[in-house]
């Protein structure tokens, strides 16, 4: 029996994860991370920090007969996630705040707190899997000096490919995976709902939220206007030859691949190609120019903890819901790689993550850099 802290959002995924661990005989404690203090009009009931979702998690824990606590991480969330989100947009990147929340709050901070409180593991309702290989399959882990086999932890895609969240977890390393559990990674979403309903869990039919928790409705522009009005400086919209074809209302309001809302008339459809921070300019061009075969990535980490010594072939995924496609990754220097795709990719976006896979196994990933 293990002592397990499970992070609970109030939704069906983490609720079933808690139930499965409890039924397996583990000593389970549910916790909800209070990250964002939105007012009632701004914070939808379906979002993770709402009072309704907190009460949902509390009801499930009461139903299971396990302890439940709420941890306040508002200060850490603002510093590590909201400020990052605003800073990235102001710098001409398109950020992924949920990925940063996973990195800094849901795993780094929560794992540290769980360890301090004497828990063996942290579990979540993420759709991903962890596999433990006793015999190393690569050179990243060698047998221990006494000849005993060493455990090597692999992060894998979930069984449900549509719900798979491994892209958002690429930053996890060996020490993290050794203390994490993803109980629902072997199930499809339909199976999760059915299993939750069979147990009578209060959250079995709760709808999913697709919004960023601190940007209900998905419109981040109001947050930028409130907190970083200095970043919304009007400037030129330039074509690929440098000709001004219009004016923009601030770089953070645009993203790579955008067509609508540009307010320009050039005789052909034009798309955002790049955000030129130095000139405070939005660069536009035809759809064909959006496709590229190469990119550079920075802040790259590998699940194995070892840096590759040579180029390697893999499947690379450049956004959360994109397909992973064949590519070759060439290490350049610590934490930086160059990636060449077998076929051109559309709208490669600086600030988003690129994640490397070997089949279903996550190798690592990093942030797409600006050219």
From Swiss-Prot:
Per the record, which residues fall in region Interaction with tRNA?
163-165
Q: Where is this site: Interaction with tRNA?
A: 126, 352
Q: What is its EC number?
A: 2.8.1.13
Top EC category: transferase
Bilayer-crossing regions:
none
Q: Which residues form the active site?
A: 101 (nucleophile), 213 (cysteine persulfide intermediate)
Please classify the protein's predominant subcellular localization into one broad category.
cytoplasm
Gene Ontology cellular-component terms listed: cytoplasm
Output the Pfam families linked to this UniProt entry.
tRNA_Me_trans (PF03054), tRNA_Me_trans_C (PF20258), tRNA_Me_trans_M (PF20259)
Q: Does the keyword Ligase apply?
A: no
PANTHER family named among the record's database cross-references: MITOCHONDRIAL TRNA-SPECIFIC 2-THIOURIDYLASE 1 (PTHR11933:SF5), TRNA 5-METHYLAMINOMETHYL-2-THIOURIDYLATE -METHYLTRANSFERASE (PTHR11933)
Q: What does this protein do?
A: Catalyzes the 2-thiolation of uridine at the wobble position (U34) of tRNA, leading to the formation of s(2)U34.
- What's the protein name? tRNA-specific 2-thiouridylase MnmA
Question: Whose protein is this, by species?
Answer: Roseiflexus castenholzii (strain DSM 13941 / HLO8)
Q: What is the lineage of its organism?
A: Bacteria, Bacillati, Chloroflexota, Chloroflexia, Chloroflexales
């Amino acid at each position: 029996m293990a002592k397990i802290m499970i992070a609970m959002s109030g939704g069906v995924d983490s609720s079933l994860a808690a139930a499965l661990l409890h039924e397996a005989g583990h000593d389970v404690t549910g916790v909800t991370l209070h990250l964002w203090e939105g007012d009632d009009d701004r914070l939808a009931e379906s979002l993770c920090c709402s009072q309704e979702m907190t009460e949902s998690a509390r009801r499930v824990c009461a139903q299971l007969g396990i302890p439940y606590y709420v941890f306040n991480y508002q200060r850490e969330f603002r510093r590590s996630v909201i400020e990052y989100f605003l800073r990235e947009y102001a710098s001409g990147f398109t950020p992924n705040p949920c990925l940063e929340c996973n990195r800094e709050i849901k795993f780094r901070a929560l794992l540290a707190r769980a360890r301090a409180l004497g828990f063996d593991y942290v579990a979540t309702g993420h759709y991903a899997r962890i596999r433990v290989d006793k015999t190393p399959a690569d050179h990243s882990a060698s047998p221990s000096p006494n000849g005993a086999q060493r455990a090597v932890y692999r992060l894998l895609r979930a069984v449900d490919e549509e719900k798979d969240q491994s892209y958002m977890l690429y930053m996890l390393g060996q020490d993290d995976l050794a203390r994490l559990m993803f109980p629902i990674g072997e199930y499809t979403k339909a199976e999760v709902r059915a299993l939750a309903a069979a147990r009578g869990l209060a959250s079995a039919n709760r709808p999913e939220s697709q919004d960023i928790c601190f940007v209900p409705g998905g419109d981040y522009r109001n947050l930028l206007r409130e907190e970083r009005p200095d970043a919304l400086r009007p400037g030129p919209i330039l074509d690929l030859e440098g000709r001004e074809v219009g004016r923009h209302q601030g770089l953070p309001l645009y993203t790579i691949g955008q067509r609508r809302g540009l307010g320009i008339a050039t005789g052909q459809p034009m798309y955002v190609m790049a955000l030129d921070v130095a000139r405070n300019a939005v660069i536009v061009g035809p759809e064909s120019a959006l496709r590229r075969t190469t990119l550079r990535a920075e802040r790259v980490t590998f699940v194995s903890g070892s840096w590759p010594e040579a180029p390697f072939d893999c499947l690379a995924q450049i956004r959360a819901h994109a397909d992973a496609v064949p590519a070759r990754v060439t290490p350049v220097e610590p934490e930086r790689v160059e990636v060449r795709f077998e076929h051109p990719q559309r709208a490669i976006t600086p600030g988003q993550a690129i994640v490397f896979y070997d089949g279903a196994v996550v190798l690592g990933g990093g942030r797409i850099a600006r050219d």
